[in-house]
């Protein structure tokens, strides 16, 4: 059976979100700053089902848009980062990084079960979620996601069987 790929260009398919984050102890990214992220996706697999799709574009975009909406206009906070000391996560997210104390309303935050909010970790999260959800419906062999922090600058993660 021949493998095929479908490709979704995030800038044209409107797969984007705007969010703030920080990379603790990084020289220039250690302060809260934001990006207008764009998410590109490639799905590889065997054509299957009634319509002979690798995966329905709509299904792929729906999953990506759901994740984008969770992140959009939020401060992305990785809960498993050892450099972040959390003192509270009830209604107000309180944490400390390198002596700097933060107190942010919970509704303005996206608490993520990740070690970092870097483009690399975000691309891994998108790819893993897509792979898991699409595998239950389609005969896919790999998912590649590029999370761009802006045009021309992104991180790619590929997950495969």
From Swiss-Prot:
Cystine bridges: none
Residues annotated to bind Zn(2+): 21, 33, 35
Cofactor-binding details, from the entry: Binds 1 zinc ion per subunit.
Presence of keyword Transcription: no
Necessary cofactors: Zn(2+)
Keywords associated with the record: Lyase, Metal-binding, Zinc
Keyword Zinc belongs to the record: yes
Pathway: Purine metabolism; 7-cyano-7-deazaguanine biosynthesis
Catalytic reaction list: 7,8-dihydroneopterin 3'-triphosphate + H2O = 6-carboxy-5,6,7,8-tetrahydropterin + triphosphate + acetaldehyde + 2 H(+)
GO molecular function per UniProt: 6-carboxytetrahydropterin synthase activity; metal ion binding
Pfam families listed in its UniProt record: PTPS
Entry annotation: catalytic residues: 29 (proton acceptor), 73 (charge relay system), 149 (charge relay system)
InterPro entries noted in UniProt: 6-PTP_synth/QueD, 6-PTP_synth/QueD_sf
EC number(s) stated in the UniProt entry for this protein: 4.1.2.50
UniProt similarity note: Belongs to the PTPS family. QueD subfamily.
Function according to Swiss-Prot or TrEMBL: Catalyzes the conversion of 7,8-dihydroneopterin triphosphate (H2NTP) to 6-carboxy-5,6,7,8-tetrahydropterin (CPH4) and acetaldehyde.
Misc: The active site is at the interface between 2 subunits. The proton acceptor Cys is on one subunit, and the charge relay system is on the other subunit.
Name of this chain's protein: Putative 6-carboxy-5,6,7,8-tetrahydropterin synthase
Organism: Methanothermobacter thermautotrophicus (strain ATCC 29096 / DSM 1053 / JCM 10044 / NBRC 100330 / Delta H)
């Amino acid at each position: 059976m021949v493998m095929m790929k479908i490709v979704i260009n995030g800038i044209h398919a409107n797969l984007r979100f705007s969010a703030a984050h920080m990379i603790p102890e990084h020289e220039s990214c250690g302060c809260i700053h934001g990006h207008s992220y764009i998410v590109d996706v490639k799905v590889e697999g065997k054509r299957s089902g009634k319509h002979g799709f690798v995966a329905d574009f709509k299904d792929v975009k729906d999953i990506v848009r759901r994740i984008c909406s969770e992140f959009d206009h939020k401060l992305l906070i990785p809960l498993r980062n050892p450099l972040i000391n959390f003192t509270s996560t009830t209604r107000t997210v309180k944490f400390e990084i390198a002596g700097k104390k933060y107190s942010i309303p919970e509704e303005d935050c996206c608490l993520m079960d990740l070690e970092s909010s870097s483009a690399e970790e975000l691309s891994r999260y998108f790819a893993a979620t897509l792979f898991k959800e699409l595998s239950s419906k389609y005969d896919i062999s790999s998912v590649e996601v590029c999370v761009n922090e802006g045009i021309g600058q992104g991180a790619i993660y590929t997950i495969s069987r």
